[in-house]
A protein has these predicted regions:
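Active-site core segments that coordinate phosphate-bearing ligands/cofactors
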Residues: 1-120, 127-151, 156-217
Length: 217
């Protein structure tokens, strides 16, 4: 039994009777549509690869307030540094989402839950292979991409399982598209630590999690 003193981690009951721990961050891919509505996001994403080493730092909240991996109702999005244009700002947001994802793993690790094992990415964001590679780099671990990554496919697996073992049915239906290995020479750890420091300095991120995130970087 793991207790979360901040109450930001919760569990869903799985159909197989187990519990699935998780959290819902207010930062995510929705910020791209919010900031660049009506734009060709694929085209921006392609141009953003040239700014992998940007010094622009972004905390990509979609709206006011954060709920995971820390609770901060007054938290607001920010972007620090001068950019060369939309493509660099887009790159900073992609990195910011990946940094928040890493902070989520750091918090779960701080609570004492295992975070090792195979990591599979799902959802619409997996259509961008470069962003998936970025996430592998920031997380410093391999990520698996599957052929069908949409939530509707998960519902199809549940329907197909019936009274069979869900894990067995999922293993039969899910097909791996690619496995992306992390590139350790990309230098994201320093920028991640910068973001942790900015969140802590604003009083949103607690000292204990900030120290743990730095120690794991």
């Amino acid at each position: 039994l793991v207790r979360d003193p901040t109450g930001v981690l919760y569990s869903h009951r799985a159909p197989c009777g187990r519990w699935l721990p998780g959290g819902a961050s207010s930062a995510g891919a929705g910020v791209l549509a919010a900031r660049f509505g009506g734009r060709d996001l694929d085209e921006l994403g392609a141009r953003a690869t040239a700014f992998e080493h940007t010094s622009v730092l972004a905390y990509p909240l979609v709206s006011r307030g954060e709920r995971f991996p820390f609770a901060a109702p007054d938290a607001e999005a920010f972007m620090l540094g001068e950019s060369a244009g939309d493509a660099e700002r887009f790159a900073a947001l992609l990195q910011g989402v990946a940094f928040v994802e890493r902070l989520c793993f750091d918090y779960v690790d701080l609570l004492g839950l295992p975070t090792n094992g195979e990591l599979t990415l799902t959802g619409g964001a997996t259509r961008s292979r470069s962003w998936c590679q970025l996430r592998a780099d920031v997380l410093s671990r391999p990520v698996r991409l599957v052929e069908q990554a949409e939530a509707a496919f998960g519902m199809a697996i549940l329907a197909a399982a019936g009274d069979r073992d869900l894990a067995t049915v999922a293993g039969e239906m899910v097909r791996t598209r690619a496995v992306l290995e992390p590139r350790p020479d990309r230098g994201f750890a320093e920028r991640y630590v910068r973001l942790v420091g900015e969140l802590e300095a604003r009083g949103w991120l607690g000292e204990r999690l900030a120290a743990h995130a730095r120690a794991r970087s």
